[in-house]
Amino acid sequence: MSSINTETETVIKKILPYMKRRGYDIEKDFDFETAVSTTDRYTKGYVDILVTLGKTHPLFLIEAKRIGKNLTNKDRDQAISYARSKEIKVPFVVVTNGKDIQCFNSKNKQRIIWDGRRSDKIPSRSQIERVVKILRAKPEEIMISISNDESLPFRQGLPLRQLNALFAKGHNTIRKIEKDEDFAFADFSKLLFLKLLEEKNDLEENFTLPYSYRFYELAETPVHNADQVKNAIKSMIEQIVQNTSYGDVLREPLRLENPRTYLGLVKDLASVSFCDCSVDSKGAAFEYYVRATLKGKKLGQYFTPRELVQVMTCLVGEDKIINSVVMGSTLKVLDPACGTGGFLVYLMQETLSKLEIKKKNRELTQENYDQCVKKIKEEIFYGSDANKGVAASAKMNMIIAGDGHTHIVHEDSLSINAVNWKVENPDCNLIMTNPPFGTAEGDSLAKNDKEQFQVSTTKGQYLFLQKMIDCTVAGGEICTVIDEGVLNTSKGASLRKYILTNCIIRAVVNLPAETFKPNKINVKSSVLYLEKRKEPDFDLEDNYRITFCAIDSLGYIGSGDKIRDYDKSVFLEEIKKNVMNHGLGEERKGYHWRAYDVWTNVIAEDLYFRLDYKYWDPKFKKELSRLVKEDCPSIKQLNMIVTARGISPSSDCYVDENDGYALVVKAGSNISRFGELVITQDSDWIEKSLYDEYLQRCEENNENRNIIRKGDILLASTGDGTLGKCCVFDKSIPAIADGHVTIIRVDKNVIDPYYLADYLRCGFGSTQISAYYSGSTGLIELTPEQVDMIIVDTSGNKADIDIQKNISKNIRRTEKKYTAQIEKAEKVLESVEEIWG
């Protein structure tokens, strides 16, 4: 097969999956870009696809036009001119724009009617020789029977953005016509399920539907007969419920009332071939619809990108499930927060695919194969979700993927009554999941539910992690997505010790910031890969290496668009073979990843048992160790007051400068990224009476939390975009710091305040801040205790105050030069308007 390299490449790639389903071998049956010497054009022509079946004489050709271009008689005539050329001589042609398919007789230019109807079909490979034989005998024939072919006509697959738009359109259809969207997700899911069943019926020989209705036929119904579509859909559901083993997923009645709603949704769904959409696109679009219609953000639901699912599968081992199945081992794979079933569908399909390969390689008898298929579909995969509609969708997904819905349950996984896992009877061999982030599940749990958990908490993730550990068999594995805060906050220390006590931590994988951004979720997260211990290690005496890995790209940007030339196969192969390969050295890196090892005895000595990648980074630790050896002081040693943050005044107490007495220094607006104190007419002030209250409180408690003096160093200590900003308060006016600012007061004879401020905002102090801060996206902070840990570089000549001042002056001089150049460049850009006059 020659390569495809034309302006119509995208169109050709859209129809190739359809041709493959029709039985054609893309490599052996097609020639691409075949030159044609006899043509109506003045220049040489090329046939986009010539169907030869590997023979000397071609059978028909396919002419592809640009996506979005309406097909015209001119397009038909061009294809037929190729068909009539001396090199080609085929009896019929196909013209397509990636959306429509039209077949024409090469002799009379008439549209060919297959089985008495004009449809977007191409004869299958098993039918084509008979079709060509008919046309050779009757060159002008246009009414051709292809054995009552009941296959679906061609429809295009859609990329993610267009699928999102299609699903959003469906949601709008329900909202506008029904005037009620409470059941939009459940109802749309049922119609989508019917369409997916229709495609499954088209693809699989051993799967049949108990009715003859088809979406593409119903879509042709005129609006005044829309009630026929409504009746057809209800009849389809009724027959599935009554006559199939999977009918329970459709038992909940449809709430849609208006026939026009049914017709509109059927038209939209009939326009797409979902089996030709990428798995990523289908899953992402479905999850997009979940969020848009369920208001399910309370449950922390969001889509786990396929690339991340693949990374997690590579970590635990791609062949683990199939090997267990073939060997006859007992295996239970659970996702306790399964959503619409993304993990389970992927794992089941991959396992079935690997089993098929083993059969083709003659490693299994047909009987072995059949037994394994049955086991994979019925005994291995379990899933739970707290939302009834989402759990039903997971069942639907599993049915479409291969009828593995038996153990998908609508339940609260954290309840003691959950059926898919029990703390008192651990039976999970592998848990792969992405549990809800940011939920406070503990508040909704009954007293007996809480008794399951040894580490008391209300955080949903913490509860999920504990129950995962407690419900996994010894030697079983857990691979879960987690909020970064689980790895580093002081509140999570008890949980991390519980993990270290009960599990061997195989890997902690730091994920790129854009991991969940395609679905409008901005969460910094990691993957935690654990193995359940046979016996708890209460004293944390077991010393082994934990792999810490950072991935810088999963192959797509924040919008979801794929990165050109990103080689996912190379990336996944290295994740599988190299990331946890300690033999490659304690520090190792590869294609879009970097990893290092840390011994657990070091982590056990850490006050908070931190497990975040940035905290243990070897480069950071090496420089920190150097400063400690040089006997450099910490902030705790330098600060003449207790390092602390106060409480912000109520915004009701803020006044303008004219009415105020003391400035309120805010981390976001009063401290610049270049180390300057910023006071504007919009700055907030408080009256003297309130300032005196703060002053009195400091004197009574014998500690200063937010009263600022001239020369104090002010460190912004919370929030994305503000944390780490630092300045020196250089005004002789009363001021207090808000609750997001840490005050550091030093002896100017020991260290220069400006040097320290610059060290914290752009020197190695900034690196320490990045390593020490805790929390996750949107909720990060540097606690006073973490500020105290920062070591200040006074090594060598930096101990000299004059040297410190000179370093700071040079830094600020360079920054002012930079800002001046930026301002100058902006003025140059503004002059563009003057060019227009």
Please name every model-derived segment:
Residues 73, 636-653, 668-710:
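Sequence-specific dsDNA recognition surfaces
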Residues 193, 200-293:
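Long recognition/docking surfaces used for binding and targeting
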Residues 710, 714-761:
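A short beta-sheet element
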Residues 578-661, 796-837:
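Non-catalytic DNA-recognition/assembly elements of restriction-modification systems
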Residues 1-92, 100-148:
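A short, conserved, highly charged catalytic patch centered on acidic carboxylates
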Residues 64, 304-430, 438, 483-484, ...:
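Conserved S-adenosyl-L-methionine
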Residues 121-135, 422-636, 783-784:
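A conserved structural/catalytic subdomain of Rossmann-like adenosyl-cofactor enzymes
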Residues 528, 734-742, 774-802:
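A short glycine-rich beta-alpha junction/loop motif
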